[in-house]
């Protein structure tokens, strides 16, 4: 059944009001179906990535077990066995974490820009204090959003920038239309081209940090989508990289 049709309303009588109510219900059903479809496609992509990235650890484990059975395994083989077992454990924990994010409800409440500004400053001080990060945000007004969700994304982006920045991080918060934009810029080496072109992947390693599995950026992307927004990554022409998270919002002047 398609829900892309519309019901034009030509009068304000009971029939017109009924048509308006049906059209509102249709729009909500369409939005719900689109979200379910997006989640199903994302789950399919995630499962494929999980299966693909498990192949190498499992192959190494099989080879090491074979050496153990033959009695030819050395201490290095035992270390390798422990290392790859830990990797599989991390993959499993990541899968569980992503599932919890997808099921997390969005709770909208009203907050002041000044509160968000101070919390961003505190987060930046904790995660990137040595880099003397700068934070800019509107001084007045309130905004309606999921406070915890937005701060979680901010923590992920600031923490990621702190790992790669050379000397500074700039954090900027602003409203554009019906969206709140949070951008985090660093002066590090920039994002890999593949990451910018394909977007964050749940288990995508970055060469600069072999312990980083891309979960921070990937989970931020999921949270932005849940809040009706997006996550975009780009490299600066002069230096560094910028991650911009957008969130659909309702704002009071």
Where does each model-flagged region fall?
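DHp/HisKA dimerization helices and adjoining segments of the cytosolic kinase module
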Residues: 35, 39, 58-164, 171-172, ...
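H-box/DHp (HisKA) helix C-terminal flank immediately following the catalytic phospho-histidine
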Residues: 49, 53-57
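Short hydrophobic beta-strand elements within the C-terminal catalytic ATPase subdomain
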Residues: 171, 231-234
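Short beta-strand/loop element within the Bergerat-fold HATPase_c
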Residues: 168-178
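Membrane-proximal HAMP signal-relay module
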Residues: 1-48, 61-70, 100, 214, ...
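Short conserved segment of the HATPase_c
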Residues: 191-204
